[in-house]
UniProtKB/Swiss-Prot annotation:
Protein name, entry field: Uncharacterized protein YxaJ
Cellular-component GO terms for this entry: plasma membrane
Annotated localization: Cell membrane
Keywords: Cell membrane, Membrane, Transmembrane, Transmembrane helix
Length: 141
């Protein structure tokens, strides 16, 4: 599979999981943590999902049109996403330990957040692996 296809697949999965974190958090007790928290199916939740999709789609579209340097812009955004998902996972753990809510009430959000962080790490591997690491079927060494 080509590097561009790998990046496209991982970017799509990453965008889906980022949106899933927002939706899952709005369905969990985390939705009641403050005035800025999104309730499920609210305008705030949909605007957050829309903003994430726009922030994924624009650099992805430019990259797919052939601007290979956009991979570095996407890497910075992926790094921000990794930071967001890992800090969200830490916040969710702290929330469950120091509130009246059990870990079982937020475990799905925690799992999706950690899965999104793992996908972002895999995205870096897919985007920046070297061509020398690929094994060829035709070599007889």
């Amino acid at each position: 599979m080509s590097k561009k296809n790998s990046v496209a697949i991982m970017t799509t999965i990453s965008a889906f999981l980022f949106c899933a974190v927002i939706v899952a958090a709005s369905l969990s007790p985390l939705a009641g943590t403050g005035a800025a928290a999104n309730q499920f199916n609210s305008a705030g939740m949909w605007s957050a999902v829309g903003m994430i999709l726009v922030l994924y789609f624009i650099p992805f579209l430019v990259y797919m049109l052939g601007v290979d340097a956009m991979r570095y812009v996407m890497a910075v955004l992926c790094g921000f996403g990794l930071l967001i998902h890992l800090s969200s996972a830490g916040f969710i753990l702290m929330f469950s330990f120091f509130s009246d809510h059990l870990l079982s009430e937020v475990i799905f959000v925690l799992g999706v957040s950690l899965a999104a962080a793992a996908v972002n790490v895999i995205w870096f591997v897919a985007a920046f692996r070297s061509g020398a690491e690929k094994t060829s079927v035709n070599t007889l060494t």
